[in-house]
Amino acid sequence: MAEDVVIVNGARTPFCEWQGGKRGDGNPGGLLKDVSAIKLGEIAIKGALEKSNTSPKDVDHVVMGYALQTCDQAIFGARHAGLGAEIPQEVPMLTLSRICGSGVQSIVTGAQMIMLGEANTVVAGGMENLSQAPHVLRGMRDTYKLARPPKAGTELEKDMEDYLFTNLLDGFCGSFMAQTSDEICKRKGVTREETDA
């Protein structure tokens, strides 16, 4: 079993407010609203490999996570981000979710793989674009069949669900993930500047 596991280097994409939010200066967010989480993950993986002088061919495993699956290829997002970063298709790639802790869990999972001797080099991290969170119409499968639009004059009686809010709101405490992290920062005295560093 490996005793020493190190993070060689890292890269991150710009941090932007989601499309429905406001930036610190009061202007609307959404600067990266048209860039998928997978593309952002690909960019971060390429950057980390370049900064650490590591060839994509030397990667033994890719582990990427996110809170919400917000684009059409998101179910296997790690694979698409890894392939986009030119990691060979033979390399196993794992997508996971631990809500806001997904990126950190990816690093923990990658470290465990190395410690157990399953891999020597693991790319691990998170990717997200909440501006692309879909709206969901629950019950539509029962009402309308796939590829058949509603008939003229029919009313949609299903409630529209905002996937962003329903998935990031903790039903037990009634708070959103961001509110929870803000509260923890207040209690621990962590500033926004320290958080972003």
Write out the residue ranges for each language-model feature.
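Short glycine-rich phosphate-binding loop at a beta-alpha junction
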Residues: D58-G65
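Acyl-thioester C-C bond-transforming condensing/cleaving domain
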Residues: A2-V5, T13-D58, C71-F76, G82-A197
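Short, internal active-site loops enriched in acidic
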Residues: A67-Q69
